[in-house]
Amino acid sequence: MRKATIHYLANLNQKQYLKTMKRKLCVMSAIVAAALFATDASAQTVLFKSDTVSTCYRIPALTKAKDGSIFAFTDFRPCRTDVGGGVIDVVAKRSTDNGRTWSKEQTVVKGGGDNVPFDVAHGDAAVVTDRKTGEMLMMCASGNVWYWQSTLENPNRVGRYYSKDGFNWKGEEITDQIYKLMNGAVHKLFFSSGRICQSAKIKAGKYNRIYSALCTNVGNVVLYSDDFGHNWTPLGGADARPAKFGDEAKIEELPNGDVLLCSRSQRGAGRIFNIFKYSNAKRAEGKWQTAANLDPIYKSAMCNGEVLIVNAVRKADGKKTNVLLYSVPMDAKRNYVGIYYKELASTADYASPELLTKGWKTFRLSNTDSAYSTMEQMNDGNIAFFYEETHQKGGYDMVFCSLPLDKITNGEYVAGKVKK
């Protein structure tokens, strides 16, 4: 073979080698970038930063818009205390990329109307987005009366707000409408902050049914609405008391369409579960079961949390199933927020509230003082988790993170089809 030919082939082989290596490096770079991106997505992000001087935030709430974007709401509390103690606004941020980046903070419901008692403060937001229209509903604790000092003559007030875009809200006071539902038995109440539940199965009018739990002086009262919050009705009737010693509570729809109540206890640490079993879902007929208390081996502080059921796939055998999540500080005091989880493979797993008091597994998220939390599943399958951490003289840092289901469940389950 002539030297020129050998030289040509050597150059050709070198070019091919360099081209191949370049392709491999590109692939490796993409893999590394994806890994870093995923790490960033699940990392903790302080969305609202409190301090001990002038900035005070509390109370997390989330909703997923129809386009999949996530809205995070919280109280901005110049008064550094609850509704009744001074001016409080509801503020928000939005993420369009599953929690990786966020918009600037924006006030969405403003307090400070000293001449109008209802408008002094608005907080403890409970929110939901209608899955069909994209309209958003927010229920607020409002006014200038402390919850503990509320009377029928001078009650703590209730605000209702609607929005089409998550940032511009219009609302009104509906205090009388809500108090009258319990026929005079309730003289103090508020909608539990966080996530209002919308049914995926029951539609008795234009909208799918929604549920929210009241914290009252007679324990929990669960309300439902078939017209997206314009009118509310006590589930089980005006005298129904699904958790007589319940405090702040959350609602979730069970896989068969029945209604799960998960409540903070007024009597100390722990959790109360109850289930409303429908006999006729469309007419909202049925009965609450006997409330059951969480086994005390599962530490749960006196604190608001969240409850959520997601479609899942069991990694051990690839079978579709459901996983129930509930979040709470995993301590006697407000420390170590985490998520308890358990599988609901069939109706037999939630045939009674008693069955929900045991069999939980744990995922601890926070390693310090932490309190209220809420969660929502995003369109990428991850759980949007928003919670209070690091107490700051009446406020907390409001922290967001995106959690894959397999991380929460220690590798046992992955997310199934995301509920729309």
What do the PLM-derived regions correspond to, one by one?
Residues 42-420:
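Asp-box/BNR beta-propeller blade signature and adjacent active/binding-site loops
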